[in-house]
Amino acid sequence: PASSHLGSELDFFKGVTECHLYGVLIKDIIVASRLKFGSIRPYGFTTDIPIYKRFFSGGSYSVRGFGYQQIGPKDADGNPLGGDYQFEGNIELRYPIAGNLKGVVFMDTGNIYATSFSLNAYDLSYGVGTGMRYVTPIGPVGIDLAFPVIHLRPIDLSSYYFYLTIGQGF
């Protein structure tokens, strides 16, 4: 918790729970998954959480298929406002291509909730895609191509995002 008694200007509790599961499907084919839930709640004299403390989702290490921090509530100009609750889920199939070159196919999902949390499949943003990882001595370097899936409608192939990554997303 952040507390005025501990030197903070704000009083709030913020918690994040994240679960990672990995399994070998067949020989060198790995299934990797992640679930993340976050919550921030004010108390005491703090009534609203300032934007710089809120949760944001979207982007290469979050929900691919969307721009950085572009999931969730936005102001009238389309700028992200963040929220008090966060949900993200990822599943990725990792497979060898040749030597240090690996391939991935994935589906990501998530949402940011302004003031109340209600998990509903139609409220979530989804992204699907594929990518490659080159394994170096300091970790993988990757490139992903992802498409947003809006309200579970068919994929629009003209709307896509490329991501360059260093390290595993999860």
Question: Which functions belong to the PLM regions below?
Answer:
Residues 1-97, 105-109, 113-115:
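C-terminal outer-membrane beta-barrel translocator/porin domains of Gram-negative envelope proteins
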Residues 8-11, 117-120, 154-156:
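Short, solvent-exposed loop/turn segments at secondary-structure boundaries
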Residues 21-23, 93-95, 134-136, 145-147, ...:
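Residue-level signature of outer-membrane beta-barrel architecture
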Residues 26-31, 99-103, 134-143:
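Repeated loop/turn-to-beta-strand initiation elements of outer-membrane beta-barrel proteins
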Residues 39-52, 141, 147-161:
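Outer-membrane beta-barrel translocator/channel fold
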Residues 115, 120-136:
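Strand-loop-strand
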Residues 132-137, 159-170:
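Outer-membrane beta-barrel "beta-signal"
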